[in-house]
């Protein structure tokens, strides 16, 4: 006999991790009806690209009709850039904002963020603190 225990009743969350070029709004729209309580993630968004976002850019991050838990993942190596990106996206209703500190993606290749942050805990902490302070 098979026993099914809902993850939520165990205090467990099911996350769909960020996948570059995949976890965009279209995939999230497909996944949400399949598992409404799943915590979905955006692709890694470069903080520098969110310095002066247009309304169209912001809508692509979280369309007005998108519901359910959603995490915005930011990639960046500068505290000022990350803080600015957090402020720019503050009104979009993300449940969490995550600092990418482990991505091996070629998108971060040679950059001072992503997996390279694993080598410098003090710097990673200062970036996370800048993001938290910007969020208020």
Q: Which role fits each region the language model picked out?
A:
Residues 61-69, 116-136:
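Alpha-helix-loop-beta-strand connector modules within alpha/beta enzyme cores
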Residues 15:
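Conserved Rossmann-like nucleotide-binding pocket used by diverse enzymes
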Residues 36, 93, 133-136:
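Short glycine/proline-enriched coil/turn segments at helix->beta-strand junctions
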Residues 72, 98, 110:
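Short glycine- and Lys/Arg-enriched binding-loop motifs that mark or flank ligand-binding interfaces
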Residues 10-11, 69, 104, 111:
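General secondary-structure edge motif
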Residues 44-51, 101-122:
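Glycine-rich, proline-tolerant flexible connector loops at the mouths of alpha/beta enzymes
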Residues 92-102:
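Short coil-to-beta-strand
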Residues 2-5, 10, 19-91:
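Glycine-rich, positively charged N-terminal anion/phosphate-binding segment
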